[in-house]
């Protein structure tokens, strides 16, 4: 009887409303926003306001109502089409109980999911019951019924005060792993690693680990001065031997023209240029000797050897020049004399005296029978 009376009452209310009104989804969203906007601390209080009718300014289309004697179910009428009033009353009578049960289940699931998503990160359990005053204990037991340990209390304290974690990180303090047991100390010299790794602890403090120190300008200058004092030529060795007391220095090289005293090693130009910061590299001064060089009497490959320097014109006499070549299967060696004051050429030829003091015939060319080529110089020599 009560159910029939309730259906008749709802039908009369639907008839008083405008026919063809549609249920808007914004009413359900508004109801969920009103529930979710409440603080978590107010859930344990009186929640009888959840069973009151929510009046929204949506017009005749909103039909959310709650039964005063029910279990918190929200009744929503079925969606009406633009049909006649008689058809809407018949369809309302037949589908009213099913729509109420289905809408109530959907609202309960939505409310439970909304509260579970918002308070899922906290360790406080939410109780959405029938509407009674179900308070939450300050320190409720865990899932197995045992009282909470000190670690869980510390986790709750850190969740309630998130600024404390930021202060610890700003001060450079190590952040301990929550819910893990710290390893015991390995002795007086070892430090506790607080469960971070299984490596043996070192003697230094874990609070100083990973702290970067910005060097001051004074520290940088001290490092630069220390690096400058280090010798840069530690791996190099001087080319000349150093003077050792009680030992005799080696004789001077005949190519060395520096003229240093015998008790002191020869000095080079590089010693005056090098400073204390650059590595000492000594280069020997190799200057060509002053004077004439001995000229070989035998030319190579049929050509006379050019020593590269002018001969001394003060030395009077002749020099012997040779040319060796092959003729008709025989090796022919021809030789002749030229004045010493003349220039040595690559192409063998007779040269005249430049100083006008060299003899025309010497003991080397006295036995010559023929000349290499019949030039006036040869005729003059053999004629005389």
From Swiss-Prot:
GO terms for cellular component: host cell cytosol. Belongs to the paramyxoviruses V protein family. It is found in: Host cytoplasm. The gene is P/V/C. Changing residue 341 to S: 32% decrease of in vitro zinc-binding, attenuates viral pathogenicity in mice. Residues 50-59, 191-206 have a biased composition (Polar residues). Interacts with host IFIH1/MDA5 and DHX58/LGP2. Interacts with host IRF3. Interacts with host RIGI regulatory protein (via CARDs domain) and host TRIM25 (via SPRY domain); these interactions prevent TRIM25-mediated ubiquitination of RIG-I and disrupts downstream RIG-I signaling. Residues 1-23, 38-317 are annotated as: Disordered. InterPro entries: Paramyx_V_Zn-bd. Its main location: host cell. Zn(2+) 2 binds at residues 341, 353, 355, 358. Plays an essential role in the inhibition of host immune response. Prevents the establishment of cellular antiviral state by blocking interferon-alpha/beta (IFN-alpha/beta) production and signaling pathway. Interacts with host IFIH1/MDA5 and DHX58/LGP2 to inhibit the transduction pathway involved in the activation of IFN-beta promoter, thus protecting the virus against cell antiviral state. Also interacts with and inhibits host IRF3. Blocks the type I interferon signaling pathway by disrupting the RIG-I signaling pathway. The C-terminal zinc-binding domain is involved in binding to IFIH1/MDA5. This domain is also involved in viral pathogenesis. This is Protein V. The modification Phosphoserine is found at residues 68, 125, 192, 249, 257, 260. The lineage of its organism: Viruses, Riboviria, Orthornavirae, Negarnaviricota, Haploviricotina. Zn(2+) 1 binds at residues 318, 337, 362, 365. The P/V/C gene has two overlapping open reading frames. One encodes the P/V/W proteins and the other the C/Y proteins. Residues 7-20, 83-101, 150-168 have a biased composition (Basic and acidic residues). Keywords: Host cytoplasm, Host-virus interaction, Inhibition of host innate immune response by virus, Inhibition of host IRF3 by virus, Inhibition of host MDA5 by virus, Inhibition of host RLR pathway by virus, Interferon antiviral system evasion, Metal-binding, Phosphoprotein, Viral immunoevasion, Zinc. GO terms for biological process: negative regulation of NLRP3 inflammasome complex assembly; symbiont-mediated suppression of host cytoplasmic pattern recognition receptor signaling pathway via inhibition of IRF3 activity; symbiont-mediated suppression of host cytoplasmic pattern recognition receptor signaling pathway via inhibition of MDA-5 activity; symbiont-mediated suppression of host cytoplasmic pattern recognition receptor signaling pathway via inhibition of RIG-I activity; symbiont-mediated suppression of host innate immune response. GO terms for molecular function: metal ion binding. Changing residue 339 to T: Decreases viral pathogenicity in mice. Transmembrane segments: none annotated.
């Amino acid at each position: 009887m009560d159910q029939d009376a309730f259906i008749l009452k709802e039908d009369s209310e639907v008839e008083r409303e405008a026919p063809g009104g549609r249920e808007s989804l914004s009413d359900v969203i508004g109801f969920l926003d009103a529930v979710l906007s409440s603080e978590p601390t107010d859930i344990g209080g009186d929640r009888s306001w959840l069973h009151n009718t929510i009046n929204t300014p949506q017009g005749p289309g909103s039909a959310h109502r709650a039964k005063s004697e029910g279990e918190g179910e929200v009744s929503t009428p079925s969606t009406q089409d633009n049909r006649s009033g008689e058809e809407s009353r018949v369809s309302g009578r037949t589908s009213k109980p099913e729509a109420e049960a289905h809408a109530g289940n959907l609202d309960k699931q939505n409310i439970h999911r909304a509260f579970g998503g918002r308070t899922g990160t906290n360790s406080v359990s939410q109780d959405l019951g029938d509407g009674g005053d179900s308070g939450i204990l300050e320190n409720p037991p865990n899932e197995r019924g045992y009282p909470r340990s000190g670690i869980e209390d510390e986790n709750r304290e850190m969740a309630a005060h998130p600024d404390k974690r930021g202060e610890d990180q700003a001060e450079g303090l190590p952040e301990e792993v929550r819910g893990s047991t710290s390893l015991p100390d390995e002795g007086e010299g070892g430090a506790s690693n607080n469960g971070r790794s299984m490596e043996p602890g070192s003697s230094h403090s874990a609070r100083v680990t990973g702290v970067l120190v910005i060097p001051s300008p004074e520290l940088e200058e001290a490092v630069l001065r220390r690096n400058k004092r280090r010798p840069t030529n530690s791996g190099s060795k001087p080319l000349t031997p150093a003077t050792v007391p009680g030992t005799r220095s080696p004789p001077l090289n005949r190519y060395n023209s520096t003229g240093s005293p015998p008790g002191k090693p020869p000095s080079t130009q590089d010693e005056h240029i090098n400073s204390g910061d650059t590595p000492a590299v000594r280069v020997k001064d190799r200057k060509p000797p002053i004077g004439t060089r001995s000229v070989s009497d035998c030319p190579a490959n049929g050509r006379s050897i050019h020593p590269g320097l002018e001969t001394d014109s003060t030395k009077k006499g002749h020099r012997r020049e040779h040319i060796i070549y092959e003729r008709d299967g025989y090796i022919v060696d021809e030789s002749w004399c030229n004045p010493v004051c003349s220039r040595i050429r690559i192409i063998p030829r007779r040269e005249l005296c430049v100083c006008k003091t060299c003899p025309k015939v010497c003991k080397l060319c006295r036995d010559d029978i023929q000349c290499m080529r019949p030039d006036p110089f040869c005729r003059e020599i053999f004629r005389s």
